[in-house]
Amino acid sequence: MNTQDLAKLRSIVPEMRRVRHIHFVGIGGAGMGGIAEVLANEGYQISGSDLAPNPVTQQLSQLGATIYFNHRPENVRDASVVVVSSAISADNPEIVAAHEARIPVIRRAEMLAELMRFRHGIAIAGTHGKTTTTAMVSSIYAEAGLDPTFVNGGLVKAAGVHARLGHSRYLIAEADESDASFLHLQPMVAIVTNIEADHMDTYHGDFENLKQTFINFLHNLPFYGRAVMCVDDPVIRELLPRVGRQITTYGFSDDADVRVEDYRQLGAQGHFRLVRQDKEILQVTLNAPGRHNALNAAAAVAVATEEGIDDQAILRALESFQGTGRRFDFLGEFPLAEVNGKPGSAMLIDDYGHHPTEVDATIKAARAGWPDKNLVMLFQPHRYTRTRDLYDDFANVLTQVDALLMLDVYPAGEAPIPGADSRSLCRTIRGRGKVDPILVSDPAQAAEMLASVLTGNDLVLVQGAGNIGKIARHLAEIKLAPQKTEEERHG
């Protein structure tokens, strides 16, 4: 951003007083990196630390940020404030050093709240669909020429970034309930896509506590703000009378203010009508598959309609929507002659979904778009606590595929829990008699084991939130073909 643009922005959004150098602990995470990127473009000096380089840290380095691939006390020297990821423990040496030096230490959401303070904030919350809905709202506002700032938890593929600094007063951001830090945000508009039991350790295992936290989040809206809520979700429907703000509902339900009708899916596109109160019916072509994405689009349209955005801009944005990274991400279609000698081909899809509801939605989208394909899933459970808490739900959902390969649980720092491991989950699924799971204990063998179950007319879903995305990219690079050893190559 040039000096003239920065001065124009300052007239809209005052800078943080006396803050010059902002240090991020855990800067490589998508949410942290996105905020750092916006602040770097606003002219702040950015530094940060993480354990290893990734595309987020590479992008920030190109913007002039100083990145350390270690955690040392000296990294926070001269920082005005330290921003910490929820994944970072209190005994991290940089956090300890910041406290000793009386440097303010704040959570990611507190910094996001500062970015939002002087802007028209639109926050997207909910157990599932936040990232895609944030991208859809951002795409519509950009198509309408409103040049929003956005901060997303996933890569917005059309922009090639997780976050972008716009020149207008609009800020569109994903709001994270995992550590309840979204309570720091004070948006003008808030979307809640759905509410399910997840991250229950934050809420002391009390679902009522989780529900009340969402109510408190919505009551951060000003009295003239608006809550946009999915009435199809039974928990949201239950909570509606407790929300003391203006509400727009959306969903497939007959009483939704923005109603999805006549949904059908052709390949990777959804086609449906959106019926709005006192507005023209929209005939939507959405470049994203699945009924769940139609709901995400309905939420985005509800917000855009409230803002008075032109219908044609809305329709163009949805039809050209490029999606987000690792959300039903098409990585290619590969001939099987080079994989296992069989005629035919296999499509490869990478998806971040790691909760049973998300996995179910991905499977349904795959079945609806490609009903004749042999559906093969390579799945990596994420966290032992989630596997334990949702064990039966995972077992039920994963029986819907034709072939299932399962990696070990990605621990995300958790200690193993007996009975909540992949071997136990495979045993339970096998006992239900619908699919015979294959346990992939060594990720290096994933390609070879995957090749053994391909039939010649396959759709391969690589599913999970841990490091399985790297495996998906590797499978795409080798075009699903297992790499032969020297002995195999030379007979």
UniProtKB/Swiss-Prot annotation:
Protein keywords = ATP-binding, Cell cycle, Cell division, Cell shape, Cell wall biogenesis/degradation, Cytoplasm, Ligase, Nucleotide-binding, Peptidoglycan synthesis
| GO MF entries | ATP binding; UDP-N-acetylmuramate-L-alanine ligase activity
Q: Which GO terms describe its cellular component?
A: cytoplasm
**Phylogenetic placement of the source organism:** Bacteria, Pseudomonadati, Pseudomonadota, Gammaproteobacteria, Enterobacterales
- Is Transferase one of the keywords UniProt gives this record? no
Protein's UniProt name: UDP-N-acetylmuramate--L-alanine ligase
**Gene responsible for this protein:** murC
Subcellular location as annotated: Cytoplasm
Q: Family, per the entry?
A: Belongs to the MurCDEF family.
Q: What is its EC number?
A: 6.3.2.8
UniProt GO BP? cell division; cell wall organization; peptidoglycan biosynthetic process; regulation of cell shape
* The keyword Cell wall biogenesis/degradation is annotated on this UniProt entry: yes
